[in-house]
């Protein structure tokens, strides 16, 4: 059976089927048996499942299957799946039946570049995802569209911070830094100059460096628009589905990811759609690729949907020979990549939140067990709760003569990559304070202090020179000497990388002058996360407060007299 695109959005695209009663294996129950075929004959190693349950089996070399342990007397709904085929079924069968036949149909094996993307949003789109995947109370909804609409992926093309970096403006877009000045180097040609201190400075911008050259930023930020022109798509001018950022249909057309055979990360200079392989169907047909092998209609199962490799194209980036962002590669090198005991990107960033449907019941959304549906509310660098579960902070202290000696241990406990990761403007700051019983600060006599980029000045969040440590990948621009730099499209070097790999612990030590009175001393350590270096955030007008990730205090009791 082939469905038209219009019919599909109302039915197959929402991964539907009749909802059977919940089933679990039963000792001594009845059996169903049968065969899975395509037009050429039996299909070996096909997966046959009692729909929306954990009961499943695989076909033998002759395409035959049998399912044991079914409750007797109750009809079950069977589906079948195999790589390269649309999911087959549903077929209803009562236990005891041995002649069940499930037909599989191959889906397209090539990509149709002329395919027109299905829009996520209802507005202006006859066929869309919101129609079936959204609740009226979207703020508390667990349905995919409602979660995606609140997620950064759904706004990646219109993210004002991204556009301010792309265009060289402040957050409002109304103020812009001057176009980059260049000098001519006798050996290397044009080289950018530092900003003119006599001119307004709203921070760097790709388009300031390369006016008229769109670059490849849209390959990740507006992939549906950039797929046909990854090097010439200007995010300022994308329209239609392209403005939906990492939109639903794009992810559910993703069939393969290109990884370098040696490095096992995407090839250099191939970000986003440049490292993605799609299966867009021909006119009059559909193909939705997802994590369920029992979603019938023009849907198919892909194991890639459950793997970290799915995320790799947009979470690895190398510029001018420098690895700028690489959360995927960091995960690969960590213990989280263990195939048995590890965790995927999806496990942490698409956590199962208890959803039981991926479409509304009135749209025939199939009811599933809680814990089987990935959330599309993908928490990341702006999610306070996620950040507060990331690091463990331990503080020990002792009084030694006229000094209080402190040791602080910061452990990347729950991130499967470095922390912080990806965008090089992100940084994490450890602050260590000591105070007497009257809450007066004690003088620090150690050399472990925060750098200038932690903030110079008298504001409460100007931390430069205070006891503590900064964790960041600090880039320095080769030609201008600017550091730290977030203009990673320029030639840079990694001046230092103090970030914490997965499960790593960093130990720092501090000394404070103890109160002469011998009174109690309180040591407080705090870890805060900043989405950008303070000077950059100020120039851009990004009003993002520090996020407190962890805090710990110890009291050194009064010295005995």
Predicted features by range, described:
Residues 72, 513-518:
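Short, surface-exposed loop/turn segments at beta-strand-coil junctions that are enriched for proline
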Residues 47, 53-69:
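Short, acidic Ser/Thr/Gly-rich low-complexity loop/linker segments typical of extracellular
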Residues 115-116, 139-204, 230-502, 510-514, ...:
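Primarily the internal scaffold of c-type cytochrome electron-transfer domains
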Residues 41, 46-50, 77-78, 432:
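Hydrophobic beta-strand segments
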Residues 19-31, 38, 396-401:
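Beta-strand-rich domain onsets/edges
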Residues 29-46, 71:
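Structural motif
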Residues 23, 92-120:
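Extracellular beta-sheet/turn segments enriched in Thr/Pro/Gly and aliphatic residues
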